[in-house]
Swiss-Prot record:
The gene is CTA8. GO terms for cellular component: nucleus. Gene3D superfamilies: Winged helix-like DNA-binding domain superfamily/Winged helix DNA-binding domain (1.10.10.10). Activated by phosphorylation of at least Ser-570, Thr-574, Ser-576 and Thr-577 in response to heat shock. Additional unidentified residues are also phosphorylated in response to heat shock. This is Heat shock transcription factor.
Amino acid sequence: MIMNMTTDYRDPLLDLFGTESNSGNETSSPSDIPVINRSGTFNQQQFSPLLTQQSLYNTPNSGSTPNIFDPNYTQMQEEQTSPSSNKLQPEDPPRKKRNTRSQTKIHQQSEGDEYNSNDYKDSIDLDKPPVVEPSPPFFVESDTTPEFVIPTPTSEQQQQQHHELIAQDYQRSNNSNQFGNLTHYEPNLPPLPPLSESILPQTNTFHPLVLPHDPRHAITAGPANNSQQQQQQQQQDSSIPSDGISSKIQQLHAPSLSNNQSASQRKKKESSGPKTRPAFVMKIWSMVNDPANHEYIRWNDDGKTFQVFHREDFMKVILPKYFKHNNFASFVRQLNMYGWHKVQDVANGTLNQNSDKNGQDEIWQFENPNFIKDREDLLDKIVRNKSSSNQDDVSGVSFNGINNSANLSLILQELETIKMNQYVISEDLRRVRQDNKMLWQENYLNRERNQVQGRTLDKILKFLSVVYGNNANKILNGHGFADFNDSNNIMTQYRPSPMGSPLLSRPQTQPPPSNSRFARDNNQTAQPTYESPLSTSDTNNNNNNTFEYQQAVNRPRLMLTNRAHSRRPSMSRTKSTPEGSIEEIIRSYSNDKAAESNVNRMYEQLVGHQPGATTNNNNHSSSTAISAPSPRHSFLQELNLPGTPRNLDDLEKHINKEGQSIQQVQDWIDKLAQEQHEKQQQQQGNDDDDDFDVNEFLKDATTTPSSNVPNGGHYNNGNISFVGSPIAMTPGSNVSSNINDSDGNEKKSKKRSIEEVSDH
């Protein structure tokens, strides 16, 4: 049988890379690469699980919470519970069907048999990596979680809806967490601009410079890079034959081998070449051993040190011969660099009293363990002192270049980091300055408002102190009006009408005060008491808010009292004249009924009630007028409403002021009349017989009220008498109150009581 090569040919790269030539990015079947677990955590995206992983919401077999947004969720549950669905569900996770256009039916059948065989399944289980069972979720009772995730087949529209809903929920959660319910602004004031946020944690995405020889580059590299490198090495190892492995290893380790070879070559060169003695050491050796210089420099007796005499002469004579300078300090410094040390002798130096002050007789002695008399071979050991870097070079460390480059890279990286931090700090400083400026502006505005409110409160307190006097403190402290029930501090309540059109009917807020006792004494009928301005419908609807409504609407009205207005001379009893006294005002008010009715009529018309309006229609109209909503804010805010026209506001204030002033005058008159009446009754009840004057009584009985002498009268010893009128004479009584003495002066007679008359 001859096979067709066009249909039976199969590209070997399909098994290696897992893709078809016509399939694009499609994955291969499990028969190609059975080791890779595509449903594991290795191929899952870690940063966007909410928007990309459908298995978190559409998998009923997983341990997570089912998706409530999926309309097919209930249908899925029913299908899973049915017995027929259990037979249809495959045991292994479904895999995409392989493109079999380049295979024959024989190959397909053979692959199907291999897939269904138990040996193949066992090989898959052995090649799979160990699966770590995650902890069970919080809201699921099942203790076991499935190994594979079966994705639910969903349409593109459903997936798009899921994405949109998840994005909306995520945005709402961010908005709620950002602001929350922490800030509440006043409705009348504009909201404050939010303070700017720091840019330190958000925008610090700076990636420092990384050089190729940076040692931290290998440390910062993640496990992903290591895994990628391992995969690449495996592929290269699989593609490279066994004979080329050694060459590959040699290529990888070529730099290190070259460095080691260069270091060993340096060591060999240094060891093989002849050692050269330093020129300075040889000059010192010849200088000390020359007999011509023994006057200035020579060996010590023990031969281990040499001494220098006459320093000034040594500088002028010896040093110029061997060196290009004549500086003794530089000569000593070079000796120290090559290992010589100064030996301090007790017999020399400043401790010697015979030495000159200039130090000419001072002997300088230097010692070196390798500089000994007649031991020239030890001069090879005298070397110049070297720094740590030079010692490292001599020791032959092969990684100096790498270390230097690494140190340079670290320095550059730290420099870039410092620059970035400085930029971030400057941005934060600018932000703090802006916030500080804004806070200062708000503080200035609040201070201005506080000053205006303080001036307003001062005016209110001064006004209350003038009106109420000493009782203003009780009102301000909130003791209520229970302490002002006495006659001198009568308080009434005044409720202003709601803001609106001036054509609306105004209900009477408070009837004029009436006293039944005072009305009966003056032959007047007491005025009927009016009901509360609140209608029955309002009372039924506002049972729970009665106290709050009365506290917000009813306000104490200013009263005129004797104490508050005692400063005016026209109202003072002590300084008033007989023509304009308060008694005459009370008398006219109590006697003139027309004036009283006129005042009451004016008051009722201003407030909104007509006298005698007791019909049902009027009551209905008043209740409807009263049922209008009244503002619950303060009086100052009521006058400053932005939607109220200016002319209506002024008219409303004018009407309220006129009605209040008329009611105040009326209440003031009622109060004064009541006080005067009570005082008169008290005086009449307190009259005693001890104050009764008989002479005055007899005088009133015998004389007329007229002050002029009538036509029938004549004077009798200075007394007025009438013709034919009887004169009551009592023992020791005087008819006239005035008696003329012998000198013609008038003397007042002494009053006599009833007891004195009875004694006579």
